[in-house]
Amino acid sequence: MNFLPTWPITFDTMTVFGLLLILGALGGYLSHRFPWLPSITGFMLIGLLFGPSGLAVLDEETLAKSRILVDIALGLILYRLGLSLKLSLLRERVTLGVMGLAESSLTIIVITGVLWIAGFALPVAGLVAAIVVSSSPAVLLHVAHEVRASGDVTETTKTLVAINNVVSFVAFSALLPLVQFSSGKSWSEILLLPTYRFFGSLILGCTAGAVVYVLTHRTREATQYRLAFVIGGVMLTTGLANVFNLSALYAPLVLGIVVKNLEQEDTVSQIQFGESFELFFIVLFVSAGANLHLHDLITLAPVVILLVVTRSLAKVGGVVAVAAATREALNKAVARGMLLIPMAGMAIGLTRTTAELFPDQAASVAAVVLGAVAVFETIGPPLAAYAFNLAGEAGQAQKHTSPEALATTVEEAS
């Protein structure tokens, strides 16, 4: 009877992929029955229900096999995010860069203090603050399309989101030595690991970005192969980052930044991933929900609420402060700050990195960060809609959008 499967049955990666997609699609469908509940929250709730804290269909071993799928999802999302950071725009509008750095710094300082007062060790509080300074472009782009928003606030906020995520990773890397020291790591790990991961990921991302640009530029007549070059470049970069123990988050982010700033005609950055991109997006959030520990989430619920309120005030306050100093319109500053409130991809990725480097801190950090992600992705859409109306940019986009532009907008929102 050797031909029969062993018991208990173990799932391979392909089975896990199918399971995550089916469960995620179910969660997304159910979320559509409630107008106030975004699909992202539905994905996370279904993951929590079927994860180790719920029905345990997705146990720890199954989730471990989904890592490659989550890495691909994060790589694609962060590559798209990197395409939002145009350095020439920052040179033209210096105050935009100052605004991004000031708002990010204020958020890190305030969140660190609040979490420290709440009982977190100072290094861990700083690490969580570095994670949650990141912002998600998904809500911004999706709601902008829904309300037909267009204008200065809409475009410049994309750059601020990219700045937030770069600052998040840099601050996370800078704070790693403090957490490692408090965890009793060796000095070689404390000093060399963050340096190696940061500069190694930077070099890998720059190299991959240059290669993707050259390949797509030299073969620009064969447009049918551009998507293969881009997807292949992102996956190769993510894979090499794992092989060399670099950051599978920062490297694809840098890849996107390099491609965007090398090209002159946006031929690569406008490439559409298509509906298949949504599949990995579903996998990412179902996996994130499954990794939540219900007991820790309930225990730390007051901290999550405190984090949500404090981070929101810091984001808006930082942008408004710089705008006031530069005499910019208050309504536009408040709108930008509100559009920076949603949080998702980078935060989830850095939470996974924290769990890998510091298993003893994984449960509490995941409960706080992922709990906040669920809240921010729920309140994000109505906040964004209000922000676009406040800025006076809702309804300003062309009423008749081309199918190509529409596909690009929807894809980026994913």
Q: Where are the language model's segments positioned?
A:
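Entry/N-cap segments of selected transmembrane alpha helices
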Residues: 3, 12-27, 68, 86-117, ...
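Interfacial loop-to-helix junctions that mark the boundaries of transmembrane helices
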Residues: 3-13, 35, 58-70, 97, ...
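Core mid-bundle transmembrane helix pairs that form the ion/substrate translocation pathway
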Residues: 12-29, 162, 166-169, 173-283, ...
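Membrane-interface junctions of multi-pass transporters
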Residues: 31-38, 49-95, 216-225, 233-307, ...
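Hydrophobic alpha-helical transmembrane segments in multi-pass integral membrane proteins
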Residues: 56, 110-116, 168-179, 235-248, ...
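Short helical (or helix-break) motifs at transmembrane helix termini and adjacent helical loops
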Residues: 81, 106-112, 131-172, 313-322, ...
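Juxtamembrane helix-boundary/capping and inter-helix hinge elements in multi-pass membrane proteins
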Residues: 83-96, 118-123, 143-155, 176-187, ...
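Membrane-interfacial segments at transmembrane helix termini in multi-pass membrane proteins
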Residues: 212-221, 257-275, 312, 316-340, ...
